[in-house]
Amino acid sequence: MNAASDTSSGRENHLKKGSKVSPYEALIAGSLSGAIARGIIAPLDTIKIRLQLQIQGYDTYKGASKTFVSICKNEGVKALWKGNVPAEILYILYGAIQFTSYSALSKALSEFEKNNRNLFTISNSTHSLIAGSGSGLASTFFTYPFDLLRTRLAANSEAHFLSMSSTIKSIYEMHGIGGFCKGLTPGLLSVASSTGLMFWSYELAREFSNNYKDVIPFLEGFCGFIAGATAKGLTFPLDTLRKRIQMLSKTRDIDQNSIKAIQLCKTILKNEGIFGFYKGFSISILKSAPTSAISLFTYEYSLSAIKEFTSKHKKL
């Protein structure tokens, strides 16, 4: 049995080193995984963003549950889906690019290792870490403006909804085209690290769970949950930094000249302490772990369905 066909719960691990996934298969399955994951976790994302953006001395929200109640009471239940249009576009594009680039990088890395097998070998988990980090860089680079728009719209605490077009116009008038790239550098570092760690953790969890495949239902989702929690737990400060920079022009307590990530880090440490980087951490874990579980579960099942459909039609 080769690496690609090493299975858990009777299904192929399509993210394993050596797995054969075509670009169009990864594109379709990745888009579906992003769309479904976003639709389910949108309210948690809004709560997380509100908590992350709070500055010491202006704490409007006190914990995830009270934030939920406050938003529903003051803005209406629909407010939990503020920023959902750019976020849905973001998740669909991100999922498509992430899994397509992961598949391509995984294949290229396998070929490189094969051609240099006398010099070194790469473990399955390390392979996933490298390919995952690369896919995180690619997907973040191409979808970042939608991430920024999602943050701006979700952060709006007014009862009325901001339109995506008015937000785009406001950013452009205030900062020019460069305004859509605010926080890109910490964003690339944050997501590349988080994505690499997610795929790394997922591969380790899949390898470990082979011994328990008969007792763990929805194995892909279970392993995805562990992967999401691990990745977010290790990279959360970078995510907070990215969100703060994205909202810098609207933050009352931070000088506009402090746009550089290092300067902003110093400002947060000075005014809020180390815990300033961990605001919204609990809700972020509650959001990220299920998101990864749903995303990886949907991707694996979608690919299995696509391959089965393609196989049947080839026989006709």
UniProtKB/Swiss-Prot annotation:
Membrane topology, as annotated: Multi-pass membrane protein
Main location class: mitochondrion
SUPFAM superfamilies per UniProt: Mitochondrial carrier
Subcellular location: Mitochondrion inner membrane
Extent of the signal sequence: none
Pfam families documented for this protein: Mito_carr
Transmembrane segments: 26-44, 89-105, 129-149, 183-200, 215-231, 280-297
GO molecular function, one term: thiamine pyrophosphate transmembrane transporter activity
Keywords annotated in UniProt: Membrane, Mitochondrion, Mitochondrion inner membrane, Repeat, Transmembrane, Transmembrane helix, Transport
Keyword Glycoprotein: no
GO cellular component, one term: mitochondrial inner membrane
Solcar repeats: 21-108, 123-208, 215-305
Domain of life, source organism: Eukaryota
GO biological process: mitochondrial thiamine pyrophosphate transmembrane transport
Role, per record: Mitochondrial transporter that mediates uptake of thiamine pyrophosphate (ThPP) into mitochondria.
PANTHER family in alphabetical order: SOLUTE CARRIER FAMILY 25
Family, per entry: Belongs to the mitochondrial carrier (TC 2.A.29) family.
Protein name, per record: Mitochondrial thiamine pyrophosphate carrier 1
Species of provenance: Debaryomyces hansenii (strain ATCC 36239 / CBS 767 / BCRC 21394 / JCM 1990 / NBRC 0083 / IGC 2968)
